[in-house]
Amino acid sequence: MTAPVEFFFDFASPYGYLASERIEGIASRHGRSVLWRPFLVGAAMKVSDRKPLVSIPLIGDYAIHDIERFSRYWNIPLTVPSHWPIATVAACRAFYLIARTDQAAAIQLAQALYRCLLYTSPSPRDLST
């Protein structure tokens, strides 16, 4: 059996959102399943002494342009929340709690969090509470 594609993402990442809308289709076309793995990019950046792209002059402006361009190219609706970046610890915990017993339901949760609460709602909500 072919190993699954491991999809590492952070709910705070617009790139993660865009990838989440396409990863299952891409994997399926190649006979692979997807193992969704949310993680905290902020924690990884902290231990590696890195900054979020949007906080780096010039790079941050380009990242926003790049995200919007990919959104248009793939025809994936995207509204970056005004309170972005966001804390995603609760979202990750909820995903892994559900994934213990039902991976499909956990994926549905991840997609719902991305689509409804973060990037496609006219007024995206804060996930940190």
What are these model-derived regions, one by one?
Residues 4-9:
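Short active-site neighborhood of thiol/selenol oxidoreductases, capturing the structured segment around
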Residues 11, 17-117:
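Structural alpha/beta surface segment adjacent to cysteine/selenocysteine redox centers
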Residues 119-129:
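Single conserved hydrophobic/aromatic residue that forms the stacking wall/gate
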